[in-house]
């Protein structure tokens, strides 16, 4: 159960643009799984607008709001770094991967 | 054939492991080490893990000589542990799962240790002593669950050791427990300490407070106490380390033996970071031999938290048909060992 937020909460809306709608959806799914810690009394709502991830924070206290936003950005940056390092769009493929291999489990090693 | 990548970062170690059908392909790890006298805090530990984790993933894939398409499942530690470090592992695991379109599994940290210990040592159905900085449990398998027969009722045995190392300002490199072990070897002078076994359970907080007073008599002066002559107290740090080990390890041996007797077991497996301790292994081996049983233990590659144990436990889960919806890929600081259905064992 989400904690009750006062009638006039402190609010913040953050819009994060991504390169493609797919990447925005990945970030939306990755970051949407976790609930805010209950005792922080923060409400976080994620939504998608094409290639933009929209995050709405509501909180009773400014300090809780700041903590929640800081934590969110840490998670967001980690997610983005992961996408940058291991995503398909990387030109120089240290770990080569093509769309044809997506979902398959081929292996050239003999058992 | 299941090829699994595991991510472990529930405490101050961040590790990535890759395993395929019981064969170790990669096992890389980094430890966050704090100055002497300090423990690691969740926020700083998570920062360290964020900085290290992507490099470790890349080097593990290189070491295993695999492409992402060779992986069948990505596993991460769902819990128990510290929330901010756990979250680092979970976020990277989720992102890789979606990027590479590979199934995702959340693994219980304790079961990771048990399954890794079983794989490496070949123990079939041992009584398990799981001892680390965050956990102290005596576990036996029964009816699709790893049952907790006994455990600490306050702090873990490794926590007790680590905090004592802080009190006497031992180095945290490579680990405070290791440094206590080395110092204990240079003494054989035993100091009587509280021995707190409660049936199948144990308690360590009283021992920690008692030995803290021995280590720093002047600190925390009891104002009610009438000023007495200062006790003759010539204990060295080595004496304290030796005595602490003898006392708490004897307690662990006792509860393990009691569990063996209850279950009619003939094998003991020690897992977890404190399982590296050679004195604990020696004491446990003596007890096992006296009972006509056998002791299994692993070295620090597998005793200490690592990504490989998560990969292996996850591979076992995956092979037996376990699947996890993406919406359930959260982390939880408390995740009891006996909450997990052990679908991969038939005995």
Swiss-Prot record, chain B:
Family from the record: Belongs to the KAE1 / TsaD family.
A GO cellular component annotated for this chain's UniProt record is: EKC/KEOPS complex
Give cofactor(s), names only: a divalent metal cation
**Name of the protein:** Probable tRNA N6-adenosine threonylcarbamoyltransferase
Subunit structure as annotated in this protein's UniProt entry: Component of the EKC/KEOPS complex; the whole complex dimerizes.
Q: Give the EC number(s) listed in the UniProt record.
A: 2.3.1.234
Q: Which UniProt keywords apply?
A: Acyltransferase, Cytoplasm, Metal-binding, Nucleus, Transferase, tRNA processing
**GO molecular function terms listed in the Swiss-Prot or TrEMBL record:** metal ion binding; N(6)-L-threonylcarbamoyladenine synthase activity
Q: Which HAMAP family match?
A: Kae1
| UniProt subcellular location | Cytoplasm; Nucleus
Q: How is the cofactor bound?
A: Binds 1 divalent metal cation per subunit.
Asked whether the keyword 4Fe-4S is assigned, the reply is no
CDD domains recorded for this chain?
Answer: ASKHA_NBD_OSGEP_like_euk (cd24132)
Q: What is its main location?
A: cytoplasm
Q: Which reaction does it catalyse?
A: L-threonylcarbamoyladenylate + adenosine(37) in tRNA = N(6)-L-threonylcarbamoyladenosine(37) in tRNA + AMP + H(+)
Q: Which PROSITE patterns match?
A: GLYCOPROTEASE
Annotated binding of a divalent metal cation, by residue: 109, 113, 130, 305
State where substrate binds: 130-134, 162, 177, 181, 277
Per the record's keyword annotation, is Nucleus included, yes or no? yes
InterPro entries on file: ATPase_NBD (IPR043129), Gcp-like_dom (IPR000905), KAE1/TsaD (IPR017861), Kae1_archaea_euk (IPR034680), Peptidase_M22_CS (IPR017860)
* GO terms for biological process, alphabetical: positive regulation of translational initiation; tRNA threonylcarbamoyladenosine modification
Phylogenetic lineage = Eukaryota, Metazoa, Ecdysozoa, Arthropoda, Hexapoda
Q: Tell me the gene name.
A: Tcs3
Q: What does this protein do?
A: Component of the EKC/KEOPS complex that is required for the formation of a threonylcarbamoyl group on adenosine at position 37 (t(6)A37) in tRNAs that read codons beginning with adenine. The complex is probably involved in the transfer of the threonylcarbamoyl moiety of threonylcarbamoyl-AMP (TC-AMP) to the N6 group of A37. Likely plays a direct catalytic role in this reaction, but requires other protein(s) of the complex to fulfill this activity.
């Amino acid at each position: 159960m989400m904690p009750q937020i006062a009638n006039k909460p402190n609010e913040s809306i953050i819009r994060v643009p991504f390169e493609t709608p797919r990447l925005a959806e990945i970030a939306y799914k990755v970051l949407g799984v976790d609930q805010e810690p209950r005792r922080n009394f923060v409400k976080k709502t994620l939504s998608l607008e094409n290639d933009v991830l929209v995050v709405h924070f509501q909180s009773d206290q400014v300090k809780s709001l700041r903590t929640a936003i800081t934590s969110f950005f840490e998670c967001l940056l980690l997610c983005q770094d992961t996408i940058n390092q291991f995503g398909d769009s990387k030109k120089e493929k240290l770990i080569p991967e093509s769309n044809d291999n997506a979902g398959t489990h081929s292996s050239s090693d003999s058992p | 054939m299941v090829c699994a990548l595991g991510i472990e970062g529930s405490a101050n170690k961040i590790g990535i492991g890759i395993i395929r059908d019981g064969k170790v392909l990669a096992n890389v790890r980094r430890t966050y080490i704090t100055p002497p006298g300090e423990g690691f805090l969740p926020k700083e530990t998570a920062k360290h893990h964020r900085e290290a984790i992507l490099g470790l993933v890349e080097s593990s894939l290189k070491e295993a000589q695999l492409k992402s398409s060779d992986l069948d499942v990505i596993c991460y530690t769902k819990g128990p542990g510290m929330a901010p470090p756990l979250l680092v592992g979970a976020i990277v695991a989720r992102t890789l799962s979606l990027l590479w379109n590979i199934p995702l599994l959340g693994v219980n940290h304790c079961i990771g240790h048990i399954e890794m210990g079983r794989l490496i040592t070949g123990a079939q159905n041992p009584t398990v002593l799981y001892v680390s900085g965050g956990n102290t449990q005596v576990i036996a398998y029964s009816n699709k669950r790893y049952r907790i027969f006994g455990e600490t009722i306050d702090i873990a045995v490794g926590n007790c050791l680590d905090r004592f190392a802080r009190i006497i300002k031992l180095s945290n490199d490579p680990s405070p427990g290791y440094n206590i072990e080395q110092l204990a070897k240079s003494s054989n002078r035993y100091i009587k300490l509280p021995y707190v076994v409660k049936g199948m359970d144990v308690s360590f907080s009283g021992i920690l407070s008692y030995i803290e007073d021995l280590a720093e008599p002047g600190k925390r002066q009891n104002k009610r106490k009438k000023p007495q002559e200062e006790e003759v107290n010539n204990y060295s740090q080595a004496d304290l380390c030796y005595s602490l080990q003898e006392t708490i390890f004897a307690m662990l041996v006792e509860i393990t033996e009691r569990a063996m007797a209850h279950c009619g077991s003939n094998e003991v497996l020690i897992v977890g970071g404190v399982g590296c301790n050679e004195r604990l292994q020696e004491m446990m081996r003596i007890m096992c031999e006296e009972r006509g049983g056998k002791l299994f233990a692993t070295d620090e590659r597998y005793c200490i938290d690592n990504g490989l144990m998560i990969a292996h436990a996850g591979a076992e889960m995956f092979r037996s048909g376990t699947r996890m919806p993406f919406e359930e890929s959260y982390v939880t600081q408390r995740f009891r060992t006996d909450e997990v259905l052990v679908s991969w064992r038939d005995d």
